[in-house]
Amino acid sequence: MFVTRLMQEKEFTSGVKPLRLMERSVFSDRMVFVRAVHEAKWMNEMEISIYDCWFDDVVSALPGVVPDGFIYLRAIPDTCHKRMMLRKRAEEGGVSLKYLQDLHEKHESWLLPIDSGNHGVLFVSKPSLQMDNSLHPDIKDRVFYLEMNHMHSSIQKVPALFLDCEPNIDFSRDIEAKRQYTRKVAEFFEFV
């Protein structure tokens, strides 16, 4: 995944700053998926150290891989698993609930770490009053800044939009919910 992100960055590099919406970033690759591979013992300590050095060098050399903002579509693993089962995509057939639980825990501990006292709570760091006033009222209570010790230095203070995507929302049938979420994402893009 990391190499794919870098190739995308190289492809998009031009004089104009593009608007890109990506499913994952190099940071979610590092903080979620590489951690999962390491914990599964598919990557040893030496390999993780090499990866970290390489990661830091590449992020420093290619500032375009640092996003202007993150959007966290938050749902519990059971909800994600049920939605996957309903989609019936062949490539998702082998994804277990346990795997989704592991990824969810890694996303939560990355974005909402336990030592901050905010694990499982939608709060990291509120925007400053000046920034807060520039936020659209529909997303004002959903935008936070990533600023924890475990965050990579290049994403400290990057805004994140947290959206709850729980089972009571059926985006395939509820057109109004889809419009509301689309508006929130558009308002966040306008903000960043």
PLM region spans:
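Short, structured active-site "lid" loops
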Residues: 1-7
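ATP-dependent NMP and nucleoside kinases share a basic, alpha-helical "lid"
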Residues: 9-109
